[in-house]
Design a protein with these regions (language model features):
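Aromatic- and glycine-rich beta-strand/loop motifs that create alpha-glucan
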Residues: 1-25
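Membrane-helix interface segments
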Residues: 17-18, 109-111, 115, 204-209
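Juxtamembrane helix-break-helix junctions at the cytosolic face
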Residues: 21, 192-205
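Central hydrophobic cores of alpha-helical transmembrane segments
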Residues: 21-28, 205-219
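Secretory targeting signals
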Residues: 28-90, 119-196, 237-259
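Helix-loop-helix units of permease transmembrane domains in multi-pass membrane transporters
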Residues: 90-124
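Junction motif at the cytosolic side of a transmembrane helix
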Residues: 197, 201, 258-280
């Protein structure tokens, strides 16, 4: 099992699609940083002499995980499921297409192969999302003052009392931001793992890679209607829950619940594939 996991991890992190995903992510981070630096520079003097002080220039309302307005942030959070799947989400399909699976299964059981594959897909997807976001956090700290935003300002509306770890945001914002970077890792991993569901069925590599984005776009269309029908004023779309600056409140429990649910779906798909292989 250990050798199988190491092999899959090596393949996941040593391919051009991983490099391409990170390149796109870092280009969007640079775009976010440039726009943020210009905005903070233009507003710095006026905020310094206003009753609101430096709240609008604070790191904790301007880094990519929370600002929701820069071109880099908007594009990143519009395509993040695709970026997560780019590094290795397509690998199960590619192994089947090239008949590499048959070669591998002469040396290891299918259960070990599939477990290693899912682990590599999860980790590579998580890194593809979390690494650019974390880099943006620390790079933004070089241009934005790390002052603690005050409660009930329009610029902190995304972090109301019901939002993700809201109390921590207003007391220990650095810890809140770092925890969110970890959550981003899990979002990326969960999204990439959804490719396992269609890896044996879809006959085109692009559509396998696009599966998480297409699924999340569908859920983004359906979940607002569900929320309205249930009179829930919370964000249900996983596409938007990956961004702290979502339109509706995103409580901690709904974020964790959706991560667990999507992980369960991916694991269930893996168990089904193992069962089908044993039957056949």
């Amino acid at each position: 099992m250990g050798n199988c996991i190491r092999t899959e991890m090596w393949k996941a992190f040593h391919n051009k699609m991983m490099r391409s995903a990170l390149l796109i992510g870092f280009i969007l981070v640079i775009a976010d940083l440039v726009q943020t630096a210009i905005t903070v520079s233009d507003l710095g003097a006026s905020y310094a002499h206003s009753p609101g002080g430096y709240d609008g220039c604070s790191l904790f309302v301007n880094w990519i995980g929370v600002n929701g307005v820069t071109v880099g942030a908007v594009v990143f959070y519009a395509v993040w499921p695709f970026l997560a799947a780019m590094p290795y989400g397509w690998s199960l399909y590619e192994d089947n297409r090239s008949h590499m699976t048959n070669n591998i299964l002469t040396r290891v059981p299918y259960s070990q192969y599939l477990t290693a594959k899912m682990a590599a897909v999860f980790v590579s997807g998580g890194i593809a999302i979390a690494l650019p976001v974390t880099t943006d956090l620390f790079a933004s700290a070089m241009v934005c003052p790390a002052c603690i935003p005050r409660v009930a300002l329009p610029i902190t509306g995304f972090c109301s009392g019901t939002a993700f770890l809201a109390k921590l945001y207003y007391t220990h914002p650095w810890l809140h931001a770092i925890i969110w970077c970890v959550i981003e890792f899990f979002w990326g991993g969960v999204a990439a793992s959804l490719c396992i569901i269609v890896g044996h069925k879809v006959k085109h590599r692009f559509f396998v890679t696009a599966t998480p984005l297409l699924l999340f776009l569908l859920l983004d269309f359906i979940t607002p209607m569900l929320a309205d029908a249930m009179n829930w004023y919370i964000e249900l779309s996983p596409l938007r829950l990956c961004n702290l600056a979502s339109t509706n409140p995103s409580p901690t429990w709904i974020i964790l619940a959706e991560l667990i649910l999507l992980t369960f779906v991916s694991v269930l798909a893996g168990i089904y594939r193992k069962y089908r292989h044993e039957v056949l």
